[in-house]
Design a protein with these regions (language model features):
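A conserved pocket-lining segment of Rossmann-fold NAD(P)-dependent short-chain dehydrogenase/reductase
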Residues: 161-180, 184, 188
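NAD(P)H-binding glycine-rich loop region in Rossmannoid oxidoreductase-like domains
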Residues: 34-83
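Conserved Rossmann-fold NAD(P)-dependent oxidoreductase catalytic core, especially the SDR/UDP-sugar
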Residues: 81-120
Length: 286
């Protein structure tokens, strides 16, 4: 069977749904975003409102859950466990985040690393992951947890920020983070749905942890632009929002060896290949 329902059609939904449709899947999904509904219906996605998630589940033999957790864990499992049990669903993919690892002061983390969440969202993500894993074990449903690094793609990227003058170069010594291109997310999830054999936890992250400054320097270089002077993190941290400060206070290098073993090489192994591709597409449009 090739019926997949995506609960929570968010920012990566067009890329993901396009890839699934091209692979011959019947794609269903839930969102109340009208503009997104219109776009996705045009490529063949059957879209349900959030009030009809139960109907969306019953169409599927595979589920992808992107809905963020609440204070009690996974909202979908808490609310719709009966519908999932009564459906033909035999595999669930859950999109989590590498933020569950917390701060490792620049050290490397892998799927077996101890989780050190401090903020409520990260703590709730850990609860949600465990909800899914326990549910899968209890009802013999394969569950695969994908911990995503920072997502970028043709719409959300530093090149667009540079063009729209919304970028502020910040430097913090020894600070690393990983990212993942939305096309790589779509490719991996397509393979996971097609195989329907994997379970457990996997980091969905690129090969090269890097500082924000390294990424910006490369972006300005390929655009042949001069980068403005950077600001030291210590000089601006007190002015940051709590969300932005959280990003800078968490520091880790994510190992993606398991990802490559299970799903092969990435389309965009590092930010360099990804930004080159994005900038080329911008040039083609201009």
């Amino acid at each position: 069977m090739k019926n997949i329902s995506i609960l929570g059609l968010g920012n990566i939904s067009f890329e993901l749904c396009s890839a699934l449709v091209q692979q011959g899947f019947n794609v269903f999904g839930s969102t109340d975003n009208y503009d997104r509904q219109v776009i996705l219906k045009k490529i063949g996605v059957k879209v349900f409102s959030r009030s009809n998630i139960d109907q969306c589940i019953l169409k599927a033999d595979k589920l992808i859950i992107t809905v963020p957790p609440d204070n009690f864990g996974c909202k979908i499992i808490k609310t719709y466990s009966k519908e999932i049990i009564d459906s033909n669903v035999r595999w669930i993919g859950y999109l989590s985040s590498t933020s569950v690892y917390g701060n490792y002061n620049g050290e490397e983390v892998n799927e077996n690393s101890k989780l050190r969440p401090k903020e409520s969202l990260e703590i709730n993500r850990v609860k949600a992951e465990q909800d899914l894993l326990d549910f899968g074990t209890k009802y013999s449903i394969l569950v695969e947890i994908f911990r995503l690094s920072g997502i970028y793609g043709n719409n959300k990227n530093v090149i667009n920020q540079i063009i729209t003058k919304k970028v502020k170069p910040i430097y913090k010594e020894g600070h690393y983070f990983n990212r993942i291109h939305e096309k790589d997310i779509a490719r991996v999830l397509c393979l996971a749905c097609a195989n329907q054999m994997n379970s457990g936890i996997i980091n969905l992250s690129d090969n090269l942890p890097a500082s924000q400054l390294d990424v910006l320097i490369y972006a300005y270089t390929i655009m042949n632009k001069s980068m403005p002077k950077y600001i030291n993190y210590s000089d601006i941290s007190n002015e940051m929002s709590s969300n932005l400060r959280r990003f800078w206070e968490n520091n880790r290098r994510v190992n993606n060896s398991l990802l490559k073993t299970k799903y092969g090489n990435l389309l965009f192994p590092t930010y360099k290949e990804g930004l080159k591709s994005i900038y080329h597409s911008y040039e083609m449009q201009s």
